[in-house]
């Protein structure tokens, strides 16, 4: 494959789709979580999701923050009946790793899913299977550059199954099975994942990342890590990583399903309220900004892969207050992008010089605000 991306500091008006209602981002900074009265005074404490925002509060969600800093959000959703979904997000991903810890966030995900010191190794999986949970579809986890999310869907949720599941999850987060045996067992798994993922698309993705984000942590910190750092992992190193990042103040829990919100809230308080982490947590590192002086182009050859061209306009990523005006501007930008992509699609259908083309905007892992144009030429 010939790959020729281009870097520019040009500023374009575009949009990243609003992350509305994403479970892992919902919570509130007060111990008690009472449904919000839309007619309350302006002095009311707004849920943390709505801090510095004038977006109307969704009163269907019950927000709260425990005294240990853990944030949560719960709501009733009776469709489909009898089912409950739990999401737990830990604010640690590959970008939080030190140079000699590459792959540790993903490694920790594997260790955490094995169980805890209160549940025999591997027993949590068997318990959930008895509750009708299918591993992979109903129970899974994912590590990204900026976070680790644990997902559990209970197809036949009862008070007993919810209580058991929340107890297991709390133990996994606070006291996972980190010992020489579990670290060695999961090392074989993550190294196998790395070997299996080392295909053409993975190499193209790595080349993209190294070029576009040169000089930034994102360029070289893929969640899967490196062979050297994975082989060097020990129980002591993984325990130190866990203590730095797996902390209640870095945790957000969301529960949605056929459940009374008051019961869901109490389950969180009962199982996570006493969680304390030793020492002091680590500060979020600086993710850097795109370097306008970095090389503008790169050609990457991958045999057997169709020729494509990617151009990127990269700007520093900055957080924005989630206001109504901000979202209106994002909507305008989204429409503009859709218009451009539609015209590119029509040009391709009428026999243009390319088979496919599209444009999109991405806020990339808190590292860049980018506009990307992708083209597959016709010859």
Region locations from a protein language model:
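Active-site-adjacent, His/Asp/Glu-enriched structural segments that form or flank metal-binding
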Residues: 80-81, 90-105, 109-204, 229-232, ...
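An aromatic/glycine/proline-enriched structural segment found at the starts
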Residues: 31-47, 215, 252-310, 314-315
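Bacterial N-terminal signal peptides
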Residues: 11-21
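A structural supersecondary motif
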Residues: 94, 134-138, 312, 337-376
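Signal peptide processing junction and immediate N-terminal pro/mature segment
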Residues: 21-34, 108
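Histidine-acidic residue clusters that define the catalytic metal-binding segment
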Residues: 39-62, 150-153, 210-251, 283-288, ...
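Mature N-terminal segment immediately following signal peptide/propeptide cleavage
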Residues: 48-89
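Bacterial N-terminal signal peptides that target proteins for export
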Residues: 2-12
């Amino acid at each position: 494959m010939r790959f020729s991306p281009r870097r520019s500091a040009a500023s374009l008006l575009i949009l990243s789709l609003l992350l509305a209602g994403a479970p892992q981002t919902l919570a509130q900074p007060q111990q008690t979580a009472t449904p919000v009265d839309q007619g309350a005074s302006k002095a009311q404490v707004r849920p943390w999701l709505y801090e510095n925002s004038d977006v109307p509060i969704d009163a269907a969600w019950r927000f709260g923050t425990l005294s240990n800093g853990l944030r949560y959000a719960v709501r009733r959703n009776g469709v489909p009946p009898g089912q409950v979904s739990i999401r737990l997000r830990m604010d640690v991903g590959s970008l939080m790793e030190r140079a000699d810890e590459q792959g540790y966030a993903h490694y920790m995900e594997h260790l955490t899913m094995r169980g805890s010191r209160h549940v025999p190794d591997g027993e949590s999986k068997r318990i959930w299977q008895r509750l009708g949970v299918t591993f992979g579809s109903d129970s899974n986890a994912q590590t990204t550059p900026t976070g680790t999310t644990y997902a559990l869907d209970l197809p036949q949720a009862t008070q007993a199954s919810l209580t058991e599941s929340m107890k297991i999850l709390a133990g996994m987060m606070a006291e996972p099975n980190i010992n020489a045996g579990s670290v060695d067992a999961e090392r074989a798994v993550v190294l196998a994942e790395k070997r299996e993922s080392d295909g053409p698309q993975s190499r193209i993705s790595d080349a993209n990342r190294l070029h576009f984000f040169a000089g930034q942590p994102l360029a070289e910190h893929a969640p899967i890590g490196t062979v050297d750092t994975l082989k060097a992992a020990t129980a002591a190193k993984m325990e130190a990583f866990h203590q730095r990042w797996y902390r209640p103040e870095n945790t957000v829990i969301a529960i949605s399903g056929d459940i009374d919100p008051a019961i869901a809230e109490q389950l969180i308080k009962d199982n996570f309220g006493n969680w304390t982490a030793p020492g002091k947590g680590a500060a979020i590192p600086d993710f850097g900004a795109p370097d306008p002086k970095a090389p503008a182009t790169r050609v990457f050859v991958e045999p057997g892969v169709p020729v494509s061209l990617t151009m990127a306009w990269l700007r520093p990523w900055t957080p924005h207050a989630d206001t109504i005006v901000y979202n209106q501007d994002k909507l305008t930008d989204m429409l503009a992008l859709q218009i451009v992509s539609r015209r590119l699609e029509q040009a391709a259908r009428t026999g243009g010089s390319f088979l496919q083309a599209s444009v999109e905007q991405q806020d990339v892992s808190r590292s860049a605000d980018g506009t990307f144009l992708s083209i597959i030429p016709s010859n």
